[in-house]
Amino acid sequence: VPIPLTLGMPPSREEPRGLLTALLTRRHPTLADALAAPADTAIGDPVVPVSALTEAPAGSAATLRIVGELDVAPERLSGLYPVPVRYQLDCPAEELDVALAIAVPAPLTVYVDAGDLPETARALVGAGHSPGLPPGREAGEVADFLSVLAHAGTGFAARARDAGEVLALLAATVAALRGDDVRAALAAPDPARLTRLIPEAAAAVREILLAVEVDDPPAVARDLAGLGLPPR
């Protein structure tokens, strides 16, 4: 059932999360590197290897929200500092069954390197995990993937190579939620349509699209503004 993402209704008095708020993220080799990264409204929780979270620096690290890249066995996740709000795993397709059985103390996003994208997404959602969407997949695959995620409770994360791909992901997620043509949204994303979303509709999109990992979040945020989608 499509979700009505109304464009013109007046917003409520509460301020839900904006469409770009804390959307972008990147990988950092160490927690210190994540702490030194520039801050921006559009930049969210950094990705840091779990193996780097055993000797965290004092001070602001205590309140830092991070995503733990799962590079240690799940049974070795006690005593991490700071405690990850989400975990992330890159998984070869032949090890998908192992990933499906992993239990960690926070939501887990799994990027599978090959295989049928929507079929893999269904398996991960069924296991309670969030699928990861890699860049460069065909529009038909992405549309089928989003048809799975639009009505799942896990959401998904994605990786993008530039601001254009981030814009397309946002437009496609909106289209999937509304029951519109996802392929058309991917091919010709309309930033003006996205900026007209009321706050509640933008928040609904972000319940599905959790984060987008890019190489240079500040540059991508600037490029998104140049494409007509400033942070708000």
What are these regions (language model features)?
Residues 2-131, 143, 152, 191-232:
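Phosphate/adenylate-binding glycine loop and adjacent helical scaffold
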Residues 125-187:
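Catalytic alpha/beta core domains of metabolic enzymes, predominantly
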